[in-house]
């Protein structure tokens, strides 16, 4: 397989790079100063693309690579891959489901606690020496708060199970009712927000879910409600979020993802009722290595004529 060209779109994992380089002719797209020259030079040898939540395979890239056979995503999300174009050209697509579910769900609960109990502020309070001047202000309890989840898939379900351990009633919105769960279903996101103290975004990003959390949803969540986003940045209308937070119409927000990563609206930096993370939902050594193994395993299976491990297309 050493002659098979694999185009890696951006830095993802040194472990993944090493494993790919052992097996294939690895081409690093981000290191090339002349990307068009790289594609023209290797267009016939590139048979696989490895992308992630930041960079995948759009229609133009797919058209530029006539011998492309498979796109393997180092992510569970597929919003950076033109799935329609892949289906049209018979290109296989894989992702990394399941292995990152637990980490992302853990982080969602961590964000809830960090926001409600103001853990980041508490840390700064101690470091700055302010504790000597007086006690920190009282915060908000998590246990018993109603948690609304947008998207009750693998990750959403894992978040729900964790929140249940905090005696939280669980509500959800999904494309369809889940008959095998006891959680309360709401037919619209606005209805869900109106009946939840904490709203968690955990659905895939599609054209239908882009800005699924808009001004109407934020107003329904209200001045005591908080928003947690561990999905994708474009799920939330960031400009409306900034307005809702600064105007006091929304109680707080904890965000692991943003609309234009790695660029974060500076208006959020000065707000005390927000927690901001650099898209680290699956960012543990164990999970990233497991994701890398899935990417490599899918490529090896494809080029060996075997069944894909996690096929999407």
From Swiss-Prot:
Subcellular localization, as worded in the UniProt entry = Cytoplasm
Q: Where does NADP(+) bind?
A: 152-155, 174-176, 230-232, 256, 279-281
Control of this protein's activity: Strongly inhibited by oxalate.
* UniProt keyword list: Cytoplasm, Glycolate pathway, NAD, NADP, Oxidoreductase, Photorespiration, Pyruvate
Q: Name the InterPro entries on file.
A: D-isomer_2-hydroxyacid_DH, D-isomer_2_OHA_DH_cat_dom, D-isomer_DH_CS1, D-isomer_DH_NAD-bd, NAD(P)-bd_dom_sf
Q: What class of enzyme is it?
A: oxidoreductase
The family classification in the record reads: Belongs to the D-isomer specific 2-hydroxyacid dehydrogenase family. GyaR subfamily.
Any one Gene Ontology molecular-function term assigned to this protein's record: glyoxylate reductase (NADPH) activity
* Cellular-component GO terms for this entry: cytoplasm; mitochondrion
The identity of this protein, by name, is Glyoxylate/hydroxypyruvate reductase A HPR2
| UniProt keyword Translocase present | no
Q: What does this protein do?
A: Catalyzes the NADPH-dependent reduction of glyoxylate and hydroxypyruvate (HP) into glycolate and glycerate in the cytoplasm, thus providing a cytosolic bypass to the photorespiratory core cycle. Mostly active in the presence of NADPH and hydroxypyruvate.
What EC number(s) has UniProt assigned to this enzyme?
1.1.1.79, 1.1.1.81
Q: Which GO terms describe its biological process?
A: oxidative photosynthetic carbon pathway
> Subunit structure, per the record?
Homodimer.
């Amino acid at each position: 397989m050493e002659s098979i060209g694999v185009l890696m779109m951006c830095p993802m994992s040194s472990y993944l790079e090493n494993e790919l380089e052992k097996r294939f002719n690895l081409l690093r797209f981000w290191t090339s100063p002349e990307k068009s020259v790289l594609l023209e030079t290797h267009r016939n040898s590139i048979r696989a693309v490895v992308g992630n939540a930041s960079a995948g395979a759009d229609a133009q890239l797919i058209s530029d690579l006539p011998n492309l056979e498979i796109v393997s995503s180092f992510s569970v999300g597929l919003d950076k891959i033109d799935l329609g174009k892949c289906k049209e050209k018979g290109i296989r697509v894989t992702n990394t489901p399941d292995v990152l579910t637990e980490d992302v769900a853990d982080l969602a609960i961590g964000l809830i606690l960090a926001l409600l109990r103001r853990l980041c502020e508490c840390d700064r309070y101690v470091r700055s020496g302010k504790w000597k001047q007086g006690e920190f202000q009282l915060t908000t309890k998590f246990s018993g708060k109603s948690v609304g989840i947008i998207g009750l898939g693998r990750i959403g379900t894992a978040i729900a199970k964790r929140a249940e351990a905090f005696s939280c009633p669980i509500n959800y919105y999904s494309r369809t009712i889940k008959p095998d769960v006891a959680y309360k279903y709401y037919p619209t996101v606005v209805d869900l927000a109106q009946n939840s103290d904490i709203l968690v975004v955990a659905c895939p990003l599609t054209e239908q879910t882009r800005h699924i959390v808009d001004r109407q949803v934020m107003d329904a969540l209200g001045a005591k409600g908080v928003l947690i986003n561990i999905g994708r940045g474009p799920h939330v209308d960031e400009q409306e979020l900034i307005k809702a937070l600064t105007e006091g119409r929304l109680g707080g927000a904890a965000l692991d993802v943003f609309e234009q990563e790695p660029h974060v609206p500076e208006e959020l930096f000065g707000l005390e009722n927000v927690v901001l993370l650099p898209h680290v939902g699956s960012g543990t050594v164990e999970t990233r290595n497991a994701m890398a193994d899935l990417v490599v395993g899918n490529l090896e299976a494809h080029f060996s004529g075997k069944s894909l491990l996690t096929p999407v297309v």
